[in-house]
Amino acid sequence: AERVAKLFLTKSAWAMILALLVALLGLRYPFLPRHITLAGSLSIGIPGFFLALMPNPRLYRPGFVERTLRFAVPAGAIIAFTVLGTNLAAERIGIPTAHAQTLSTLVLTLAGLGVITILEWPLSGWRTAVVSAMAAGLVLALVIPFVREFFALVVPTPAEAAAALGIAALATAAIAAMTARVR
């Protein structure tokens, strides 16, 4: 239950921090609502459902709220700043809006899958299957034309896809490093 709580609170943290940053800085929000639906489904909702049903051999330890917040708030901040930075950089170098939004959606979803990987480490069995299926779902959303159109995505260029993977990997590494310090 603690890992699933961390997952859902991380989403709440990045959503709140990103909304505050966009409002305070007077920036355009980096997503359409459809993008949030896709990212949230693949990196929080669907995996959260399956992960909550899996057996958890860990015993209860006092300090649930503190541990959960000490993970979720910094992880959410890292994701929010990463997504905002990605979007600002894309705009700065002249990437069209649809591509910038797709890039931000990819970074958000992949960083969310990184959070699941961190929380469920070491991955094995069903946990690996869940993360792999969600990553495959993201790829399918990009390559199936009617799904891509429904979610208002564009096929990223190879450079954009590589950038999204690299940026999400850096965000995941930052979250993993932060996690190692707060345990």
Label every PLM stretch briefly.
Residues T86, E91-R183:
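C-terminal transmembrane module of polytopic membrane proteins
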Residues A1-L123, L142-V143:
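Membrane-embedded transport module
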